[in-house]
Amino acid sequence: MIKVIKKGKYYFFFKSNGVIKTYANNKIKVADVIVAKQLAKYMSVCFKSKNKEKSFFLRVLFFSFDLDKSSKSDIIDKILFFLSTDLLCYRAKKNSELESMQKKLWDPLISFVEDKYKLIFNTTNGVVPITHKGTNKGRLCKILKKLNKLELTIYYYIINISNSNIIALNFLANNINSKHVWKCLSLEEDYNLKKWGQDKEANEKLLEKKSYFNEIIKLYLLFKNLRNK
């Protein structure tokens, strides 16, 4: 059982052996009582569970509280590395059924980041490396520097699971919801499973991927109301 205790402006979380701290010895604290109670309840589940996805939730949570100026800069550099390999820029064989589905689902997301952020992404059929507009890196860097710790954490983990800055930008801008995010990043896997039949190993990997994705979204939703205040 995790207890929530208010000290000054913040609510802190306690287990039997004391205040809950991150791997870098930072205390977990929030300013909103509703968020604090919800987080305490879910952390209790995670600490009790032997499920690796629940441990992953705690890792992501701790990651967000451990971000400082130096580590934030390192994370931004890692995110920028994905610019040239964005999932949404690489399409299936021209005029194929899958390519048609990719255009319908992915093109609106590319148009959104172009209109809102002036980020220009090119697409190709196949895996040949693409050269994008030179201003993309600087513009994305400015966007990322404005994100708070939680936002940057969510962005970073979505990037790691989707390999797409375009998807992450659309999600944090509230242009798409989490269901749409999953549909976009799992399009090819879902298509192959339906087209070629169920592959036990591939299906298990996709389900595992979704379970980790759900934990990222769980953290985002816990703090969403706090972000909007």
Residue ranges and their predicted role:
Residues 26-30, 87-90, 97, 167:
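Short cationic amphipathic helices and targeting signals
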Residues 31-34, 38, 70, 104, ...:
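Conserved active-site and cofactor/substrate-binding residues in soluble primary-metabolism enzymes
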Residues 39-40, 167-171:
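Buried hydrophobic packing segments
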Residues 172-224:
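Accessory, usually C-terminal, subdomains that scaffold auxiliary metal cofactors
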Residues 73-139:
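Internal, conserved structured core segments that host functional sites
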Residues 1-70:
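An N-terminal structural lobe/cap that precedes and organizes the functional/catalytic core
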Residues 123-169:
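A contiguous pocket-lining binding segment that forms or flanks enzyme active sites
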